[in-house]
């Protein structure tokens, strides 16, 4: 019985040493890097993903990869396999997001640079970083619970609206700058809690695109500035909207949205100081 116990102990130790040598050794790292490359490249036709550095140890990770020779992903820092926590820094530079559309099941365009930290364990973690999305100055802080986003703190400053539309692969309806400040402490649709403030400045409609997409006949330039304030509580949202345009002003003091029932109730006021400015919109005098 003692010999059997001894042999079982030796077998367990051998398996543990073998697993360590495979996973955390140079040979094992090369196998993992090759697996990652194949996993990304095989389903794609327009991606050449190459892992240039992969070093995984029990307490650290260094990872660098190149996509199509002009985009880079870098992740490095400390981790604990046994305690399941990480303290990692990331730096991502993608020059053309459209190459990832099949991989992420989203239809995106433009470029994306972002860097930050990912810190925490499997129960609670944060992702905090910066981005230049749509030529903006953006800060974000995400709180994760059980690997699901719970809280969002976002500061998006002076994003170019036309570049945001291009980012989402949408027609170029509008030019201008967009600033958003959002503090959502719970994104559960049944128990929302937070606020969002958005500002549009220097906005101008692209008449050619509007006319084509919506079968309109706009001819005069339409400038837009606007402010939106939204409060979220439970399953409801309350929104105040003010849009100031060169043809008139649209003001919605109180819009109530029932997110569960998809129901909207709102007041509105549309002010026009010069009816002649509506001629190009209405198509008649």
Where in this protein do the model-derived segments appear?
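A residue-level signal for beta-strand positions that form part of recognition/binding surfaces
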Residues: 151
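Hydrophobic lipid-interacting interfaces of membrane-associated proteins
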Residues: 33-37, 41, 45, 52-82, ...
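Residues in intrinsically disordered, low-complexity segments of regulatory proteins
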Residues: 6, 81-84
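N-terminal type II signal-anchor transmembrane helix
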Residues: 1-41
């Amino acid at each position: 019985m003692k010999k059997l116990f001894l042999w079982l102990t030796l077998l367990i130790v051998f398996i543990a040493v073998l697993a360590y040598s495979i996973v955390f050794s140079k040979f094992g790292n090369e196998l993992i890097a090759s697996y990652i490359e194949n996993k990304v490249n095989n389903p794609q036709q327009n991606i050449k993903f190459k892992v240039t550095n992969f070093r995984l140890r029990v307490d650290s990770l260094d990872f660098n990869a190149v996509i199509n020779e002009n985009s880079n992903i870098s992740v490095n820092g400390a981790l604990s396999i046994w305690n399941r926590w990480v303290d990692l820094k990331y730096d991502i530079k993608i020059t053309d997001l459209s190459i990832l559309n099949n991989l992420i099941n989203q239809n995106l365009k433009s470029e994306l640079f972002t860097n930050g930290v990912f810190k925490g364990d499997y129960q609670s973690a944060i992702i905090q970083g910066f981005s230049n999305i749509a030529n903006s100055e953006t800060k974000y802080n995400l709180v994760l619970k059980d690997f699901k986003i719970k809280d969002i703190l976002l500061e998006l400053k002076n994003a170019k609206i036309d570049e945001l539309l291009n980012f989402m692969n949408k027609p170029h309806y509008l030019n201008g700058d967009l600033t958003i400040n959002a503090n959502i402490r719970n994104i559960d649709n049944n128990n929302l809690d937070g606020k969002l403030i958005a500002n549009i400045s220097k906005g101008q409609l692209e008449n050619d695109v509007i006319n084509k997409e919506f079968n309109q006949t706009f001819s005069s330039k339409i400038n837009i500035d606007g402010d939106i304030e939204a409060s979220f509580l439970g399953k409801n949202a309350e929104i105040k909207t003010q849009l100031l345009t060169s043809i008139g002003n649209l003001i919605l003091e109180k819009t109530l949205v029932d997110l569960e029932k998809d129901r909207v109730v709102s007041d509105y006021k549309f002010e026009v100081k010069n009816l002649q400015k509506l001629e190009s919109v209405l198509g008649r005098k």
